[in-house]
C-alpha cells in the first residue's frame, strides 16, 4: 500500500486521539498488575507517576505499530504495559539523580517522600516491568516471549549506557563535547526506549518471532533525537503549567544539551570560562547568586541563537524520520479495520507532532 499522507492540520488531533485511547487501555491494564496490599510507601506509590497527566507515548507506539502491521493490538497490550512500567521506573530514578522537584505538574517522589522511598519505589516498578516480560510466555508463547525478553534486555542496556554518558559528563565537567557526542547519548538514552523498543515490540507481536524487528529503527533513531532536542528546548522555553517540570532545570543541573554545546562553541573566551565555572559546581554549591547565573546563561543562549539552532536541527531530524516511516509504511498491509487505518496515520503524523508538542 502507499504510505498515508500526514496532514499537519489533521495530524495533531489524530495523534492526540490515538494517544488518549491507547493510554486509557494501557494504564488500566498496568494498574491491574500493581499489588493492592503491601507495606506502605511501595506499590501505592508505584501507581503515582503512571496515573499523572501524560502522553503515554511509548505504550501507544507499541500498540499502534502492532495494529499498523496486521496484528491485533490487544495482543500487544502486555508489551505496552511493560514499556510504560520501565519508563516510569526510569523517571523515578532520573528524578533522584537530577534532584528534580517537579514531574508531570506535581512534586517528584524524591521531593515528596525522600530519596530512600523513591529509590525503592523505582526498583519496585522495574520489578513489575520484569514480571510483565515473564508474562509474555503465557500470553504469546515461548519463542516470541524470548524475542521480547532479548529486546527488553537490549533496551535496558542501551538506556543505562546513555544515562551513564550524561551523568559522567556532568560529573567530569565535560566542556569539549560536540553535537556528535550529544546525538550518541540521545540514541542510547532516548531513542532506544522511547521509539525503537516500542516499535520493535509491536512489530514482533504483529508478525511473529521471526519478523525483522529493525525496520523502523532509523525512524526511531531520528525521531528520538528530535524528541530529546524538543524536550531540552521546552525545558528552557516552555510554559510551566503545560510543561509540568521545572523551567531551566537543565541549566541548574548542568545537563549537556545541544544548546549548551552550541553556547560553549560560540561564546567568547571570557563567556566560555564563566559557563565552565558555573557547570563545575553542583546545584548545592552554587549559592544565592545561582539564579542570576542561570538567567545569564539563558540570555547568552538567546544572543547566540542556540535555541533556534536546536530547533532547526530537530526539524531536520523530523523530516528524516518522516521519510523513513513513509518508506516503511508503504510496505505495510492494507488496513483491515478503522483501528489499523488510524494506527498507520498515527505513525505517519507522529514526527510533526513531536516538535509541535508543549510537554
For each feature predicted by the language model, list its residue ranges:
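Mobile late-domain/C-terminal helix-loop "cap" segments
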Residues: 273-328, 332
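Mg2+-dependent prenyl diphosphate-binding active-site environment of isoprenoid biosynthetic enzymes
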Residues: 35-272, 352
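Short, amphipathic C-terminal "tail helix"
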Residues: 332-359
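Generic structural signal for well-ordered, non-membrane alpha-helical segments
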Residues: 15, 19-23, 54, 58, ...
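Hydrophobic, well-ordered secondary-structure elements that form the walls
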Residues: 260, 321, 347
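Surface-exposed helix-capping loop/turn segments at secondary-structure junctions
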Residues: 139, 209, 325-339
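Hydrophobic packing residues in well-ordered alpha-helices of helical domains and bundles
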Residues: 15, 19, 23, 76-82, ...
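N-terminal amphipathic/basic leader segments beginning at the initiator methionine
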Residues: 1-34
Amino acid at each position: 500500500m502507499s504510505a498515508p499522507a500526514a496532514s499537519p492540520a489533521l495530524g495533531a488531533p489524530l495523534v492526540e486521539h490515538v494517544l488518549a485511547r491507547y493510554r486509557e487501555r494501557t494504564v488500566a491494564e498496568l494498574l491491574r498488575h500493581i499489588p493492592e496490599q503491601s507495606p506502605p510507601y511501595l506499590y501505592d506509590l508505584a501507581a503515582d507517576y503512571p496515573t499523572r497527566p501524560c502522553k503515554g507515548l511509548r505504550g501507544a507506539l507499541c500498540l499502534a505499530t502492532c495494529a499498523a502491521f496486521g496484528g491485533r493490538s490487544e495482543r500487544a497490550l502486555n508489551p505496552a504495559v511493560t514499556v510504560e512500567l520501565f519508563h516510569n521506573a526510569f523517571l523515578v530514578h532520573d528524578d533522584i539523580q537530577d534532584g528534580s522537584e517537579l514531574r508531570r505538574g506535581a512534586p517528584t517522589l524524591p521531593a515528596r517522600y525522600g530519596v530512600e522511598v523513591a529509590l525503592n519505589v523505582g526498583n519496585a516498578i522495574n520489578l513489575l516491568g520484569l514480571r510483565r516480560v515473564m508474562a509474555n510466555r503465557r500470553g504469546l508463547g515461548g519463542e516470541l516471549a524470548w524475542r521480547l525478553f532479548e529486546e527488553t534486555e537490549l533496551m535496558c542496556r542501551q538506556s543505562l549506557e546513555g544515562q551513564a554518558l550524561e551523568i559522567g559528563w556532568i560529573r567530569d565537567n565535560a566542556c569539549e563535547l560536540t553535537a556528535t557526542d550529544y546525538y550518541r547519548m540521545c540514541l542510547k538514552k532516548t531513542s532506544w526506549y522511547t521509539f525503537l523498543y516500542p516499535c520493535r515490540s509491536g512489530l514482533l507481536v504483529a508478525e511473529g518471532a521471526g519478523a525483522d524487528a529493525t525496520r523502523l529503527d532509523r525512524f526511531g533513531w531520528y525521531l528520538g533525537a528530535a524528541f530529546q532536542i524538543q524536550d531540552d528546548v521546552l525545558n528552557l522555553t516552555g510554559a510551566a503549567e503545560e510543561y509540568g517540570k521545572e523551567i531551566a532545570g537543565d541549566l541548574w543541573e548542568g545537563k549537556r544539551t545541544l544548546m549548551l554545546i552550541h553556547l560553549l562553541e560560540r561564546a567568547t573566551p571570557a563567556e566560555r570560562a564563566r559557563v565552565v565555572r558555573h557547570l563545575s559546581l553542583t546545584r548545592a554549591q552554587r549559592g544565592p547568586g545561582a539564579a542570576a547565573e542561570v538567567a545569564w546563561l539563558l540570555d547568552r543562549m538567546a544572543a547566540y541563537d542556540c535555541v533556534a539552532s536546536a530547533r532547526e536541527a530537530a526539524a531536520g531530524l523530523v523530516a528524516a524520520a518522516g521519510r523513513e516511516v513513509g518508506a516503511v509504511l508503504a510496505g505495510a498491509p492494507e488496513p483491515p479495520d478503522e483501528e489499523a487505518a488510524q494506527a498507520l496515520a498515527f505513525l505517519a503524523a507522529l514526527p510533526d507532532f513531536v516538535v509541535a508538542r508543549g510537554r
